[in-house]
């Protein structure tokens, strides 16, 4: 059985595992105050050219989204997101559970448009009853989106300008940030992403780590008592070294970006195979997630030898499925897939 089910089905990249083994017997302080966390933070700030930024490490994506949104919003505020956004669909109501409404907007290929965000905010304030409503207090987007698509520099700049005009923070979910940055279609540099938003995170779980996400407040704009609020939400890891060592390794010798480049190269090869075999794409993704429309019978047949992710029902006879690549994807797996197709 070969698997393209997700980008976190394997363990950690071997270099990360080696770092964890080499440091295993060191006695280090807890809660992210160790030397490896400190080194990782400096390397991240250098990579994204935000010397005044502050970096914090959390364990997983849903936890990170909930912590960021709930600490940055007032109790009466909600977060604007695409109706297909991760916080809208695939986090079991985690944001709502923290007391904040997700204000869903229509999207195109997973992306929000600046004009739609602006209209949402303007419509809110033009309503005479807006004091009885949930205030739009943040904009959430992901890079790449749930569909693997990317915001261009112009699109992200326009969204950033709307947020700054209305003085609400822009939050970029970077669970797969490396794949977005290394995509051939990307025209945003890491430092431009940091400059245009108010908070973002660098995904480790889906980009080679065992677990872990690095939250970055690039403009010295961390919420008050942020570490205390992380602790209050049960998200402060006592053995913070686990995260620090991994991110220190990921941001040594460009490993994070090399991992991402490899996954993109494998995804390009995957696309070639599906095109060669005459399959239809649900949309053209420039990153490591590829969405294919399969006949239901073919899907059933293929699933006997290949693992992939269900995405959505296309019609009565077809289903959209997802194939994802990662650091562990190799040429031989794609060769096998080609035979099964």
How should these model regions be labeled?
Residues 54-73, 103-110:
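Conserved core of the PLP fold type I
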Residues 151-183:
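Catalytic PLP-binding core of fold-type I/II PLP enzymes
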Residues 71-89, 118:
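Conserved PLP-anchoring active-site segment centered on the Schiff-base-forming lysine
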Residues 13-61, 83-84, 88, 94:
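Conserved N-terminal alpha-helix of the aminotransferase class I/II PLP-enzyme fold
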Residues 99-137, 141-144, 151-158:
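PLP-dependent aminotransferase-class I/II
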Residues 108, 135-136, 142, 150, ...:
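Active-site C-terminal subdomain of aminotransferase-like
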Residues 74-78, 268-269, 273-341:
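Conserved C-terminal alpha-helix-loop-beta "cap" of PLP-dependent enzymes
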């Amino acid at each position: 059985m070969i698997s393209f089910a997700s980008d976190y089905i394997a363990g950690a990249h071997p270099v990360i595992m080696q770092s964890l083994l080499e440091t295993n017997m060191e006695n280090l302080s807890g809660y992210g105050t160790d030397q490896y966390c400190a080194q990782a933070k400096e390397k991240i700030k250098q990579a994204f050219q935000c010397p005044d930024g502050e970096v914090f490490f959390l364990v997983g994506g849903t936890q990170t989204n909930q912590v960021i949104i709930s600490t940055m919003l007032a109790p009466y505020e909600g977060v604007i997101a695409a109706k297909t956004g991760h916080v809208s669909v695939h986090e079991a109501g985690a944001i709502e559970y923290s007391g904040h409404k997700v204000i869903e907007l229509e999207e195109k290929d997973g992306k929000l448009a600046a004009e739609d965000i602006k209209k949402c905010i303007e419509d809110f304030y033009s309503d005479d009853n807006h004091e009885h409503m949930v205030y739009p207090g943040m904009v959430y987007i992901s890079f790449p989106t749930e569909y693997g698509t990317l915001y261009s520099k112009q699109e992200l700049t326009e969204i950033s300008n709307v947020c700054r005009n209305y003085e609400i923070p822009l939050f970029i979910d970077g669970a797969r940030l490396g794949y977005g940055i290394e995509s051939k279609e990307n025209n945003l540099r890491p430092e431009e992403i940091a400059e245009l938003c108010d908070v973002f995170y660098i995904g480790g779980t889906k980009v080679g780590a065992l677990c872990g996400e690095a939250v970055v407040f690039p403009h010295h704009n961390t919420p008050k008592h942020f570490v205390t609020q992380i602790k209050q939400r049960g998200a402060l890891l006592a053995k913070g070294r686990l995260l620090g060592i991994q991110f220190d390794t990921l941001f040594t010798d460009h490993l994070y970006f090399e991992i991402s480049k490899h996954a993109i190269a494998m995804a390009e090869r995957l696309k070639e195979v599906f095109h060669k075999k005459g399959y239809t794409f649900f949309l053209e993704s420039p990153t490591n997630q590829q969405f294919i429309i399969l006949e239901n019978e073919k899907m059933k047949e293929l699933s006997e030898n290949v693992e992939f992710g269900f995405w959505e029902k296309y019609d009565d006879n077809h289903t959209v499925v997802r194939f994802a690549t990662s650091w562990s994807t190799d040429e031989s797996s794609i060769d096998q897939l080609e035979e099964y197709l």
